[in-house]
């Protein structure tokens, strides 16, 4: 059975969310086109992904040198790390969903990638650089932004989107080929509110098409 892992890295508010609405259109289309596939949704804002902080590094050290001294809190923390990693490894396709925050992804998504990007699991180091271990898998990055950052008529703004480049480069590092790393940008709705309906329809149509082919 093919497994699709959707990673939601978006806060839940009463306001309309362009990225969350777009991924819902994608999911609906995907389910219709892949009825036998398993879909897992990780909501990072609700789950509070563990950070790589002092507690984490201390738990790692105790686990390596003195595992008998691990506390219940240590064991729970390490278990959560392992759970995120194993789930990511077991999936065949990934969808990352986030708004652009100050030219980057949300802190929750960055923390999640820090947790799952484990050497010798997702990639290995060689004298010629890292080699990815997730060959054959696919990713789709859905990102919303109020302005335009990926306008073919004005590509200069792409340099301001560090988040999309980060996700793409990370997936490349772990072994996903160029054709298996895809992006869907939902943009311009704040800059041109009078075009909101047009931009929404464009985003939803793209999401539907991605859902059919992904």
Curated annotation (Swiss-Prot):
A Pfam family assignment: Flavodoxin_2
Signal peptide: none
GO molecular function, one term: oxidoreductase activity, acting on NAD(P)H, quinone or similar compound as acceptor
Catalyses which reaction(s): 2 a quinone + NADH + H(+) = 2 a 1,4-benzosemiquinone + NAD(+); N,N-dimethyl-1,4-phenylenediamine + anthranilate + 2 NAD(+) = 2-(4-dimethylaminophenyl)diazenylbenzoate + 2 NADH + 2 H(+)
Cofactor binding note of this UniProt entry: Binds 1 FMN per subunit.
InterPro entries in the cross-refs: Flavodoxin_fold (IPR003680), Flavoprotein-like_sf (IPR029039), FMN-dep_NADH:Q_OxRdtase_AzoR1 (IPR050104), NADH:quinone_OxRdtase_FMN_depd (IPR023048)
Record Gene3D superfamilies: 3.40.50.360
Top enzyme class: oxidoreductase
Cofactors: FMN
UniProt: FMN binding residues: 17-19, 144-147
Keywords: Flavoprotein, FMN, NAD, Oxidoreductase
Its EC number(s): 1.6.5.-, 1.7.1.17
Function: Quinone reductase that provides resistance to thiol-specific stress caused by electrophilic quinones. Also exhibits azoreductase activity. Catalyzes the reductive cleavage of the azo bond in aromatic azo compounds to the corresponding amines.
Family named by the database record: Belongs to the azoreductase type 1 family.
Subunit and interaction comment: Homodimer.
Listed PANTHER family: FMN-DEPENDENT NADH-AZOREDUCTASE 1, FMN-DEPENDENT NADH:QUINONE OXIDOREDUCTASE
Name the record gives this protein: FMN-dependent NADH:quinone oxidoreductase 1
Species whose genome carries this gene: Lactococcus lactis subsp. lactis (strain IL1403)
